[in-house]
Amino acid sequence: MPTHNSHSQPSSEDEGPPQSIIFGDHKLPEHPPTPNSPLQQTTNPFILESDGPHRQPHQSTIYSPGPFREPSTSRSPSHSRSRSTSPANSPGHSTISALASQSGVTASAGLGMTGADTAAASSKPTFREVPVPLSPTALSRQTSKSPAKSPRMGKGEGYLDPTILSVASGSRNSGKGKERTRRKGGHKYHSLHVQDEEEEEPPESDALRTRGKVGLNAYEKALWKWVNVDDLDGFLQEVYDYYKGKGIYCIVLARVLNLLTTFFVIAFSTFLISCIDYSKLFSSISTAEAVGRLEDVLVAQCITKGSFAHTLFLIILSAFFIFQVASFAMSVPRLLDMYRFYTHLLGVPDADIQTLPWPEIVRLIGDIRKHNPVTSLSNGQATALADMVGNDAKAPAKKLDAHDIANRILRQENYLIALFNKDLLDLRVRIPVPHVLTAFIPSSILISSADAPLPSLQSEPERKFLSFGANHLTKALEWNLRFCLLGYLFDRRGQVRKEFVREKRRKDLVQGLRRRFIFMGILNAIFAPFIILYLLIYSFFRYFEEYHKNPSSIGSRQYTPYAQWKFREFNELPHLFERRLDRSYEIAKEYVDQFPKERTALVMRFVAFIAGSFAAVLLVASLIDPDLFLHFEITPHRTVLFYLGVFGSILAISRGMVPQENMVFDPEASLNEVVRWTHYLPVEWRGQLHSQMVHQEFSKLFALKIMIFFSELLSVILTPFILFFSLPPCAAAIIDFFREFTVHVDGVGYVCSFAVFDFARYGNVDANQPETGLEGATGPDGGPAADGFAAGKPSRPTTRRTTSSSPSRLKHRDWRGNENKMEQSFLHFKATHPDWQPSDPSSSLFLDRLMGAGTRNRHGGGPVSAATGGISGSIYGGGGGGVGGRGLGVDGSVMAEMEEERLRAKRQSYERAWAKSSHLHRPDSSHSHPLRHPHSAASEIIEEEEGGEGDKGDDSIDGWSKRVKTDGETDDEEERERLWKDEGVVGLLQQVLGR
């Protein structure tokens, strides 16, 4: 098979290479090339040649050989690289596409061919450049030329086969100076076989031409969407939302039904409030001439005759409904893109999304990134060409593993998890009290600034606050926190603003955050009446059927929103977190119900007996005489049917509050099982699991649904006070947290430091020295590390511990998460994604030492106590909480007996290791930060294994190196001033509407 290799070097006369390229390794056609094969050239792929008198009767679609092809036999010197369109055949998974194909372009314009050339080259593009629309001058120049007969395509296996110059042209131009210059680049191009024009046309050519006129097929659209992703965070978020929504049909159905529900609530509430004359209705019922038709009590033109408040309420709800409809219509194209991405690129049909585990989706996405690395984000903000043919051409493509995907999807949620874990948000109701009124208010509900939990509050002058309620969170308050905090920290692309990691902007950022809190407090106070009315109507329609069908459900419980944020772990996706909590509901309800409630049980038994007696008598009487059921009135206008419903509801509620007679009382064992799933065990609870204090605190986290509902209604009134008075003093601590706990990860960007799983700085990689990190870091002279360096190694760029400007704010900062949150998150993430291998040596060292400690304990037969926060619920747990196969529970997966035994043994070793690691050594309270919870003095130290200390504290490891800011780095003053100027009320309102 004759081929020709040409080495070319781009010169100053040539255009630069394209920003996006594609290549493939498909098989070449069987026909050998002809020496006189002409080079084909097309017009812009997005401009179709108009019909004209010179158009040949038989013309087929022409496919360009690629942007780096040098024409061999061309009459005009202006012939150069052609802009290509894609072929007909869909590429395989190894194909890399930077631009989807555009077919249907005629070959009549600009094709220079000799008269003796009767054969046409069948070319498949090797490289393709983003098409640039032709100018009118260039278009007229091309259309003015005499069109030549179009060659016909040869049959090939794929559309990414490489091409080169023909042998004849290559030998003829080998001595040219321009060709010698190009030969220095080392780029290799391979020729394609051609097919004679007189040969029989392949049978699929008609289909190719027809499809080319239509446009891209579904696979090419999905591939084009993937390689042109410019916001990988947003794209992965859409991928996860599509997976969580169970496919396009479930998502569309859910959103349509949600729109219909909103419309029904608005329309039906308007009808009930404005369109019925209740005076006629009740008067007709009380008289003998009862009205029996609905039209007798209807109000004519009820909507136009309504009051101003009702009209305003209706306008606001209608605008909200129209906004939801518009949002749904705008989301349909993105849903179709996700459908094509899952179906054609991942190979996951819509019916299998509901049963496929998320780790398998992550693996498929990683395979696509491995086979198709050329995207708009191949190297951060660099172009795809720099990745493939630049200085890093020999470097492997950056991987996209489960950890990277989770950090991108949960980039914002990880900060909220850390804020709740560090207890930096004061969510209590705090109202300032004038000094003249402090003598008339009980001191139990008054606090002073000296008693405030945050340092910023302690520095304020003496002032009394009326405070009631504990830290609680509602959906309304959570939405406001997302807007005020995350909308302030992140830009429109979901990336952390660089100003937050620089201390020189601290004062402006604190003032800006305080203004956002105050503004949202005022805005919530204005719209509070409308929000309460809508919540009342919606909740009545939603919960009435549930409570009417099952009255005992009024005593059911669920975790509060505040408890969910306390339980959630770093890099834990919402559906995995919900599955973990769902497994704890039954045992949590058992723990709460079995606790001694003798007085309540005695009263409820009496109430159940009385209500059951009345209900039994009425039911027996109705069976004897059925007319009594509907016509006998016990009280005026109240029949037997009404009182049967009343006494039946009382009986069901009272029975639900009476514990079962055969229940075994063991609260400590029950709470241990709850901790197994929630992974939440404060230090204050340890050793007190049987006490009433722990029961009361857990009951606040696992509250009655009816109480949560009333809290949501009450929060509409209290949220303005929390935003206006409680949260503004926390602004300084929040801004400091954003700066101190933000790190830069190569290829991912700025993320929360706890989500990186950097045990050398924020965790317990060394069991004998658990408090690693900046508190224990020393400089070369044995003193404390300063200016972001510890022991000669680069530290976090956003922290300067011993500068004169901030001598005490960062000196005693607790760099570790409370309750070993990061360690638990790492172990659970590893269990959920078994195929993931941590790239950080400190993470691997932590895992190896835990497994080693568990192995020693297993051989020694040491007991494992679930009270220490055991991880059996998430690390290979046998009760469905483990991970078998691809993230499924062991009990729910079909595995061999040997695999089950291996996982069971690993589970036991991890449990024993966790039993020892949960009692990690902590420093005394005198060196802790005021925000930190007090820890028990008793601690247990894991026996340290030999070696493994060389990697401790290294911040530049396998792509997770921290970005160090140099002293000479400057900022763009114009952009900075534009970003941080006071936008005023109008700007904040625009941001609220944008959310």
Swiss-Prot record:
Residues 1-11, 92-106, 137-147 have a biased composition (Polar residues). Residues 179-191 have a biased composition (Basic residues). It catalyses: a 1,2-diacyl-sn-glycero-3-phosphocholine(in) = a 1,2-diacyl-sn-glycero-3-phosphocholine(out); a 1,2-diacyl-sn-glycero-3-phospho-L-serine(in) = a 1,2-diacyl-sn-glycero-3-phospho-L-serine(out); a 1,2-diacyl-sn-glycero-3-phosphoethanolamine(in) = a 1,2-diacyl-sn-glycero-3-phosphoethanolamine(out); a 1,2-diacyl-sn-glycero-3-phospho-(1D-myo-inositol-3-phosphate)(in) = a 1,2-diacyl-sn-glycero-3-phospho-(1D-myo-inositol-3-phosphate)(out). This is Autophagy-related protein 9. Homotrimer; forms a homotrimer with a central pore that forms a path between the two membrane leaflets. It comes from the Eukaryota. Belongs to the ATG9 family. The lineage of its organism: Eukaryota, Fungi, Dikarya, Basidiomycota, Agaricomycotina. Pfam families: ATG9. It comes from Cryptococcus neoformans var. neoformans serotype D (strain JEC21 / ATCC MYA-565) (Filobasidiella neoformans). Forms a homotrimer with a solvated central pore, which is connected laterally to the cytosol through the cavity within each protomer. Acts as a lipid scramblase that uses its central pore to function: the central pore opens laterally to accommodate lipid headgroups, thereby enabling lipid flipping and redistribution of lipids added to the outer leaflet of ATG9-containing vesicles, thereby enabling growth into autophagosomes. Residues 949-968 have a biased composition (Basic and acidic residues). Residues 1-255, 333-516, 538-605, 660-705, 727-995 are cytoplasmic. Residues 69-91, 783-808 have a biased composition (Low complexity).
